[in-house]
Structure formats: structure tokens, C-alpha cells
Swiss-Prot record:
Residues reported in the UniProt entry to bind L-serine: T235, S236, E237, E289, S388
Similarity remark: Belongs to the class-II aminoacyl-tRNA synthetase family. Type-1 seryl-tRNA synthetase subfamily.
Domain of life: Bacteria
Annotated catalysed reactions: tRNA(Ser) + L-serine + ATP = L-seryl-tRNA(Ser) + AMP + diphosphate + H(+); tRNA(Sec) + L-serine + ATP = L-seryl-tRNA(Sec) + AMP + diphosphate + H(+)
GO BP term, example: selenocysteine biosynthetic process
Stated name of the protein: Serine--tRNA ligase
Length: 433
């Protein structure tokens, strides 16, 4: 959530910055609500002053034995008006809160202004795409003989679900273990196991609700009278970031660096018809997430560090990639600045997103009321960052395509062999005669 003081000081400036993100701020609605709020607060202050004056007058009159009934009646009327004003103020503040909850974060000044992904800016590349001396297959054709089972996944749960078997399932698990070990043993993160089902207020904290309810899988339990609504997480960023919800941490505890391997559940409501083949876009997929909670002055250094941690995974796996700075129109709702990592997929002859690393500054912290005690001993909002380190399924796709061989086998990257029992190559299971 944005700082409402920012809007009060420079409403037109904030409106322009939000317009750069493709969001139209209802300036008239905000201004009208603010005018009502100020009018009620001014009237309340006047009534409070009048009531205090009358209270003193009543005391003096009683001391003289004078009749105070008329003055007391006026005091009662003031109380009724103040109570009505308080109720009206609560209504206005609720409407302001709803308006604020729908506003995305404002972009950092270093973010390129643009409309969509066509305006993103490439920052750098690593690695050289492999030159194949045979016809390259995509991950579906490579993986199906080795244990990718789309047919059974669809039979069990419908479209965009996949079953993994045998060595492919083991390779998928090896990738997640390798990522977690790298982040915990080399990058300083604490491994965390989190709930996969969370309460609605948790999603308000990280910005998925109220705007993106249709992208979430909802879980309901209980009857009509005691129904409880919860949600499956779309990323473990949600549960990791909310660990500091409604708390004040000591400055000495920062930075907090957490990582988790979890399934992620997304309805992909706005992705009908996109990436329908294979594992690129799934309703259920695994991801290793990185989250950092830091002091405000450290957040952009932390963002660069987090991008480097995601890059390290790709480099250790020998997968070519590029780093993209997202423009204002392509960033996620909560982000102030985002870098995407895109891995090379030879069958598509292009780079595809495999990680997204974002600094949300105080946007999520304000929604969560997550604070730290600064050097002056005063509570101050933390900054929160999140990044994929990496999406496990898409990394599996990249390994299958980049490490495929002409005979249909797949070479296991050296970094994964300790997690695969020393296996250097995955071959299709022998067919029974």
C-alpha cells in the first residue's frame, strides 16, 4: 500500500507515476473523500472545543446553584453529533482504504517507462547457446519417453497438470534440493517450511488480494453459518514475507533472509490459450523462493544480491540466460523495481522467464504493519524483497532442452549428479518385448 501522505502532498505527481504503470488513479474520488474527511475532522475539533467550554461552564453554574439543564442538553446534542461524525469518518476511511488497496506501487526512478514487455530493457547476458548438430526437440518430445506424463496429469486433474515418473521425477527433486542447498549453504538464507494454505488477510499483506482473487485457488470449509475461506499459495513469497506481519523486529536482526521449496497454485485466469503445450504454464508447479526483509537504505543492494543468487543457480547448471529490467507497464502490482531472468530454450529459439526478483520497498510492509526499531529507537517500516531461485519446473524444461542428445537421452548437469546418485545420463526405460 502506498503512503497516503504521499498522495496528500503530491496527488497529481503520484497520479502520473501510476499512469506510467497503466493504472488510472481516480483523482476526483480521492479528492472528494479527502475533503469529506477534513471537513468532519475540523467539525469534530470544533465540537470538542465547544463541549470542553460548556463542561467548564456547567461546573461554574453548579457552584452558583444555577440551572444547568439547557447547557447539559446542548452538551448531549454535541455528543450525538460527534458520534454521528465518528461513524461517518469510519465509513470514509474505509472507502479510502479500499481505494488505496487497489493502487499498485509506484516505480523507482531508475525503472524505464514503458507500456508492456516490448519496452523492457536487457541488462546483460551470460553463456552461449549450444549449437546442435541434430534437429532440436522441445521438452515435451524429449521428456515424454523419459517420464513426463501429460496424459495422466490431465486425466487426474485436467489441463495444465503434469505427472513426473522415474528419473525425470528424480531430476525434478534434485533441482529443488540443489537450489535450496546453494541458497542456504552459500547465500546465507534460512530454509523454511511454510503452510500451503493461508488466510485472506495474509494475501492482502503481500498484495494478491483484493485485486488478483481470480488468479488464486480458494478453499472453503464448514457450513453456511461457519464457513471459513482460505487460499492455496501462488508462491511461498506469501507465507515467507508475512512471517514479519504485525511485528517490530530489532535492527540487529536485519537482514532476514528466508528460502523455501514449495508447490505453487495458480488458476492462470488471464492466460487462456497461452503456452498450452508442456510445462511452461501450469496450475501447479514447484518453486524455490527467496525473501529478504531489510532496512530501507539496504534494499537496492539486497535486490542486486538476490538477482546474483538466482544467476548463480543458472551458471552452476550451465544454462545460458539474460537479465531484463522490467519497464513500468510490465512490473507486478507490489513491485517498485523488478529484474527478470530469462533462460535460453533452444526449441523455441528464444529466452523465457525463469525468475523474477523484486524490491517492493515499504509497499508490502505498510499493508502488513511490518516494522523494525531504527537507530533512534523509533518503529519504521521495513523493506521486503522476493525472488524466484528458481522455478523448478521451468528449470527442468531448460535442462531437458539444453542437455538433450541425438539418441534421445539427456545429460545430467554436473552440479546435479551428487543429487542423482552419480547418474550422468538419463535414458529412456527399456521397452518390454
Amino acid at each position: 500500500m502506498l503512503d497516503i501522505q504521499l498522495l496528500r502532498k503530491d496527488l497529481d505527481g503520484v497520479a502520473q507515476r501510476l499512469a506510467d504503470r497503466g493504472y488510472t488513479l481516480d483523482v476526483a474520488a480521492f479528492s472528494a473523500l479527502e475533503a469529506e474527511r477534513r471537513a468532519i475532522q475540523t467539525r469534530t475539533e470544533e465540537l470538542q472545543a465547544r463541549r470542553n467550554s460548556l463542561s467548564k461552564q456547567i461546573g461554574a453554574m453548579k457552584g452558583k446553584g444555577e440551572d444547568t439543564s439547557a447547557v447539559m442538553a446542548e452538551v448531549g446534542g454535541i455528543g450525538d453529533e460527534m458520534k454521528a461524525g465518528e461513524a461517518k469518518l469510519g465509513e470514509i476511511q474505509a472507502r479510502l482504504s479500499d481505494l488505496m488497496l487497489g493502487m499498485p506501487n509506484v516505480a523507482h526512478e531508475s525503472v524505464p517507462v514503458g507500456k508492456d514487455e516490448a519496452d523492457n530493457v536487457e541488462a546483460r547476458r551470460w553463456g552461449t547457446p549450444r549449437q546442435f548438430d541434430f534437429e532440436v526437440k522441445d521438452h515435451v518430445d524429449v521428456g515424454t519417453p523419459l517420464g513426463l506424463d501429460f496424459e495422466t496429469g490431465a486425466k487426474l486433474a485436467g489441463a495444465r497438470f503434469t505427472m513426473l515418473r522415474g528419473s525425470i521425477a528424480r531430476l525434478h527433486r534434485a533441482l529443488a534440493q540443489f537450489m535450496i542447498d546453494t541458497h542456504t549453504l552459500q547465500h546465507g538464507y534460512t530454509e523454511t517450511y511454510t503452510p500451503y494454505i493461508v488466510n485472506p488477510e495474509i494475501l492482502y499483506g503481500t498484495g494478491q488480494l483484493p485485486k488478483f482473487a481470480d488468479d488464486m485457488f480458494r478453499v472453503e470449509k464448514g457450513g453456511e453459518e461457519n464457513k471459513v475461506t482460505q487460499y492455496l499459495i501462488s508462491t511461498s513469497e506469501i507465507s515467507l514475507t508475512n512471517t514479519v506481519r504485525e511485528s517490530i523486529v530489532d535492527a540487529s536482526a536485519l537482514p532476514i533472509k528466508l528460502t523455501a521449496h514449495s508447490p505453487c497454485f495458480r488458476s492462470e485466469a488471464g492466460s487462456y490459450g497461452r503456452d498450452t503445450r508442456g510445462m511452461i504454464r501450469q496450475h501447479q508447479f514447484d518453486k524455490v523462493e527467496m525473501v529478504q526483509v531489510v532496512a530501507p537504505e539496504a534494499s537496492y543492494a539486497a535486490l542486486d544480491e538476490m538477482v546474483g543468487h538466482a544467476e548463480a543457480i543458472l551458471q552452476k547448471l550451465g544454462l545460458p540466460y539474460r537479465v531484463i529490467t522490467l519497464c513500468t507497464g510490465d512490473m507486478g502490482f507490489s513491485a517498485a523495481k523488478t529484474f527478470d531472468l530469462e533462460v535460453w530454450l533452444p526449441a523455441q529459439n528464444t529466452y523465457r522467464e525463469i525468475s523474477s526478483c523484486s524490491n517492493t520497498e515499504a509497499f508490502q510492509a505498510r499493508r502488513m504493519q511490518a516494522r523494525f526499531r531504527n537507530a533512534q529507537g523509533k518503529p519504521e517500516l521495513v523493506h521486503t524483497l522476493n525472488g524466484s531461485g528458481l522455478a523448478v519446473g521451468r528449470t527442468l524444461v531448460a535442462v531437458l532442452e539444453n542437455y538433450q542428445n541425438a539418441d534421445g537421452s539427456v545429460t545430467v548437469p554436473e552440479a546435479l549428479r551428487p543429487y542423482m546418485g552419480g547418474i550422468e545420463r538419463i535414458d529412456a526405460p527399456a521397452q518390454a518385448s
